[in-house]
UniProtKB/Swiss-Prot annotation:
PANTHER family: ZINC FINGER CCCH DOMAIN-CONTAINING PROTEIN 15 (PTHR12681:SF0), ZINC FINGER-CONTAINING PROTEIN P48ZNF (PTHR12681). Residues 1-12 have a biased composition (Low complexity). InterPro entries: ZC3H15/TMA46_C, Znf_CCCH, Znf_CCCH_sf. It is found in: Cytoplasm; Nucleus. This is Zinc finger CCCH domain-containing protein 15. Residues 1-30, 53-74, 299-326, 358-411 are annotated as: Disordered. The lineage of its organism: Eukaryota, Metazoa, Chordata, Craniata, Vertebrata. It comes from Homo sapiens (Human).
Length: 426
């Protein structure tokens, strides 16, 4: 199969480009970071020579300009197409709780809205003009009254104004400059706006819906207080800078002396206060004193109280039918916990040698010896005890002699025959 020419050509272009970049790197090695004009000019010439060969620089610049023009033409074409065929308008998003009728429909602006009166957004383009910020220091009704002059009235309107101004209802209605509390709450809670209606009757509300001049809201007061506050570090630096250069340097000795002096001053002040209160108490000026101060000023009252106290004890009587469930209570005697010697008369006391001596074995307890066991089974023979006593008397324990001919080969053979001929049923 013959090779693909297009693939070869594409591959050769990439390889050629890599070769050119490699040649440029080799020839300009160590010169890229040089800031001299000659080095930069040399790098530019080498790059141009390797990439474009012996082409004229004017031709290269012309080809680049043509490429740029082509890009600009493409952009212009796209703009014309967008103007002819209007793109899809993105769906509108409004904040939670906002009235959609207060927002102009984006599709209606582009002339693409097909819903008509069913559209939840407004088709009134004049709403955008009403989006200017409303002043909370001006009542809109005052402006309407200023614009509503007598030049525009007819006879019917004039009669209506006269009745309102001089009628009985107007006379009964009190005049006030008090600001509506609902109006203030709406502003404090950021609920005031174009579509806010006063709960006190809307436009019929008798109170003013405008802040008086110089009135400051609570949220603005908090902001001002926060701005006036300074941090603890700034306060310390400010106080320290106000001391000046002529101050005593703080050392351990000076600090301890200052602390001692302050403590003494505090004690002296407390003593002076106590003397003053004592003098007031004696003169009868001190009307409110604590019980502790009474006994401090007149310590003789402590003994008088003990002597003159009424020692009569009162008991609460119980009914005849009730059962006396009295519980005897014994006080704790601390002398019981004092260690002392025990009287051993008439008491059998175990000797301390019980942990080192062993009791004599009985005949019925020698099962381990009969079965060939030794001292590790918990039993000891008389021979072992005698040998142990003799060894302890001599200062050492001798080894027990072992009879090597106790079990000979003949005895073992006889024992095996007896085991084989043993009748298990019996």
């Amino acid at each position: 199969m013959p090779p693909k020419k297009q693939a070869q050509a594409g591959g050769s272009k990439k390889a050629e480009q890599k070769k050119k970049e490699k040649i440029i790197e080799d020839k300009t090695f160590g010169l890229k970071n040089k800031k001299g004009a000659k080095q930069q000019k040399f790098i530019k010439a080498v790059t141009h020579q390797v990439k474009f060969g012996q082409q004229n620089p004017r031709q290269v610049a012309q080809s680049e300009a043509e490429k740029k023009l082509k890009k600009d033409d493409k952009k212009k074409e796209l703009q014309e197409l967008n103007e002819l065929f209007k793109p899809v308008v993105a769906a509108q998003k409004i904040s939670k709780g906002a009235d959609p009728k207060s927002v102009v429909c984006a599709f209606f602006k582009q002339g693409q809205c097909t819903k008509g009166d069913k559209c939840k957004f407004s088709h009134d383009l004049t709403l955008e003009r009403k989006c200017e910020k409303r002043s909370v220091y001006i009542d809109a009704r005052d402006e309407e009254l200023e614009k509503d002059t007598m030049d525009n009235w007819d006879e019917k309107k004039l009669e209506e104004v006269v009745n309102k101004k001089h009628g009985e209802a107007e006379k009964k209605k009190p005049k006030t400059q008090i600001v509506c509390k609902h109006f203030l709450e709406a502003i404090e809670n950021n609920k005031y706006g174009w579509f806010w209606v006063c709960p006190g009757g809307g436009d019929i509300c008798m109170y003013r819906h405008a802040l008086p001049p110089g009135f400051v809201l609570k949220k603005d007061k908090k902001k001002e207080e926060k701005e006036d506050e300074i941090s603890l570090e700034d306060l310390i630096e400010r106080e320290r800078s106000a001391l000046g250069p002529n101050v005593t340097k703080i050392t351990l000795e000076s600090f301890l002396a200052w602390k001692k002096r302050k403590r003494q001053e505090k004690i002296d002040k407390l003593e002076q206060d106590m003397e003053r209160r004592k003098a007031d108490f004696k003169a009868g000026k001190a009307l409110v004193i604590s019980g502790r101060e009474v006994f401090e000023f007149r310590p003789e009252l402590v003994n008088d109280d003990d002597e003159e106290a009424d020692d009569t004890r009162y008991t609460q009587g119980t009914g005849g039918d009730e059962v006396d469930d009295s519980v005897s209570v014994n006080d704790i005697d601390l002398s019981l916990y004092i260690p002392r010697d025990v009287d051993e008369t008439g008491i059998t006391v175990a000797s301390l040698e019980r942990f080192s001596t062993y009791t004599s074995d009985k005949d019925e307890n020698k099962l381990s010896e009969a079965s060939g066991g030794r001292a590790e089974n918990g039993e000891r023979s008389d021979l072992e005890e005698d040998n142990e006593r003799e060894g302890t008397e001599n200062g050492a324990i001798d080894a027990v002699p072992v009879d090597e001919n106790l079990f000979t080969g003949e005895d073992l053979d006889e024992l095996e025959e007896e085991l084989n001929t043993l009748d298990l049923e019996e």
